[in-house]
């Protein structure tokens, strides 16, 4: 994809990439300043609901690393703490053969020196899942709008016991089986568990469909 690609690849807004976004991350509890639609796509697809991501930051970061005897200034946009370690992430439109070779060199040198990984994210990594961008953005907006919503300890304990016993199922059955509580509170708690990585949630069009599948993650 070229730099003139349209946002409909991710957002269907028919405008050129480069929009500036302020978004709230429920995972990190901070407002993110994202400088393009592809950063939004990367955040919502790969970070916000990724159970292996503990926390992350976006900024204009840089670090110096020695590669083949020469010092290089490496720039990157995201600093991501996975459960298995830290990774610096550079984000751009495309990744040609030269960029792929550079990515491998930086990753190897950075790992040897600091045990930190390096990854180059491009459109080819994002486009295959672009249809999930808007559904996940809507889910994130729902969680943000309800981030201060009180949920009773009884419901929380009940849901924890239910998912621990059932381990997987369809959202509709979960709502039926837990019918002593309000559907809106049950859905909010389920989505909070998805956002925090306790459960996985599989959906085709939108996570708000009662036919969506949930599954307790194995730690």
Write out the residue ranges for each language-model feature.
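Electrostatic, structured charged patches in enzyme active sites and in nucleic-acid/phosphate-binding
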Residues: 1-219
